[in-house]
Amino acid sequence: MSCYDLCRPCGPTPLANSCNEPCVRQCQDSRVIIEPSPVVVTLPGPILSSFPQNTAVGSTTSAAVGSILSEEGVPINSGGFNLSGLGGHYYSRRCLPC
């Protein structure tokens, strides 16, 4: 059971966005000539795959505060949901008092 299961909700509503798309690419086949008799064998090309991920995590409060600060001309991080300075305890693993 995680620490967050033990705490009653007391902070802003969580906001998360995640993207996970698999990428598969097959390369060209290879041809090999085996001696002494001239035989051509076709070997299938390798299949390469990866799973790039893009995730943004924050809260509705941090998004609202960022919007207010940007309207007032205060420079904010263009990365979006940055919680530094707006309650870094969201990264903590232990329960903080509400």
Curated annotation (Swiss-Prot):
Q: Indicate the family of this protein.
A: Belongs to the avian keratin family.
The record's GO molecular-function terms, alphabetically, read:
structural constituent of cytoskeleton
Species of the source: Cathartes aura
Its quaternary organisation is: The avian keratins (F-ker, S-ker, C-ker and B-ker) are a complex mixture of very similar polypeptides.
Report keywords, A-Z: Acetylation, Keratin
User: What span is annotated as the signal peptide, if there is one?
Assistant: none
By what name is this protein known?
Answer: Feather beta keratin
**What GO cellular component is one of the record's annotations?**
intermediate filament
Which Pfam families does the record match to this protein?
A: Keratin
InterPro entries, alphabetically? Keratin (IPR003461)
Residue(s) carrying N-acetylserine: 2
